[in-house]
């Protein structure tokens, strides 16, 4: 490897990571007139012909994500939303494969929106290509220097692997630097060397395997199953989900503890038998050949949570954002929405502080911490709801009462169901939503106890009446 140091000084903002959050952060700063440079470890996707990477779990874009897209560029947001598929609720598939039950998400027909991760990332990159933002692919972050200095600008040093025959070291200086390079953030690793940062990382005992349902080529619809639902096959310990794509296919994901997938060893026959028994209708739609290929060739993905704090360095020149600061499991559909909301919150602080970025970085850490801790916990808790509770009689009863109070008692009781607050009310911070939910849960518990007591008393009265009749014979 040849090593030739090249120093390029760019006054403005340097952003590491050209994923969804990194791209939208770059567009947001550029819209405010900052000089922006974006760096990405991977090659330019336009020049890559191999298969997309492991992270193809479809995204569910909801109100928080849409608000940020519109904040950055309302016309761009409209163009993105032309490619989503609205999902008005969950469709629960039973074990027999013959019964489906729809469970609405919103009170008044609101929807979350399915969109392909790769499409959205590529679209944002295309927006960047048509802007004044500088983009450098094949840049691996090696060092982050001069963060504590008031006289010097933060310096990012990369290994540039874009040349076919050799790699070179390149350094760039900026007024401000931002890490948006995901859960395994190298930026965060370098940042914590120069400050006291609390970091927790937890792997969840859960794996995911990507599967797919092909388009329907014979019927009137290009979709085999209803595209306007998030399909769930809940089986308590494990589950299968499927979200529609524009071409008529469905991106499907099998989630299970590692012990389940590892129990099959290398035997695709065991996996096929397992799948055929637990998801019979999905098995017919996917086909044995594709399932066998997926088991034998698709990598298993790990799920982990990362939480760091504070998100900024002491002098307010560096910040981590998105998964680099708060990676979460995907079970509430809020990972990208939360990351996008990070951007809007930061931009609004910059507006409030008249363009003072350092002060905005400092305020961001304080303002955002409780919300991010809240949604990380909610995301993990929601796995139990998706895999088990959605078929529980008492859960469904509580859900009906919750929705009824939300629909008819919002004015009188200020009642808003939890899912509505998280997915459809981006004006309510996550931390405020959980406080409202705690109050409402106490009321629901009282209603549940009262109902159960009523059933018991009614049953006891009927039994006593029956006994009285028998004794009088």
UniProtKB/Swiss-Prot annotation:
Main location, first listed in the record: mitochondrion
EC code: 1.14.13.9
Compartmental location: Mitochondrion outer membrane
SUPFAM superfamilies with a match to the protein in the record: FAD/NAD(P)-binding domain
HAMAP family with a match to the protein in the record: Kynurenine_monooxygenase (MF_01971)
Single annotated GO MF: NAD(P)H oxidase H2O2-forming activity
Keywords: FAD, Flavoprotein, Membrane, Mitochondrion, Mitochondrion outer membrane, Monooxygenase, NADP, Oxidoreductase, Pyridine nucleotide biosynthesis
Superkingdom in the source lineage: Eukaryota
The protein's annotated pathway: Cofactor biosynthesis; NAD(+) biosynthesis; quinolinate from L-kynurenine: step 1/3
Protein name in UniProt: Kynurenine 3-monooxygenase
InterPro entries: FAD-bd (IPR002938), FAD/NAD-bd_sf (IPR036188), Kynurenine_monooxygenase (IPR027545)
Biological processes, Gene Ontology terms: 'de novo' NAD biosynthetic process from L-tryptophan; anthranilate metabolic process; kynurenine metabolic process; L-tryptophan catabolic process; quinolinate biosynthetic process
Cofactor: FAD
Catalytic reactions of this protein: L-kynurenine + NADPH + O2 + H(+) = 3-hydroxy-L-kynurenine + NADP(+) + H2O
Assigned protein family: Belongs to the aromatic-ring hydroxylase family. KMO subfamily.
GO cellular-component term (any): peroxisome
Known function: Catalyzes the hydroxylation of L-kynurenine (L-Kyn) to form 3-hydroxy-L-kynurenine (L-3OHKyn). Required for synthesis of quinolinic acid.
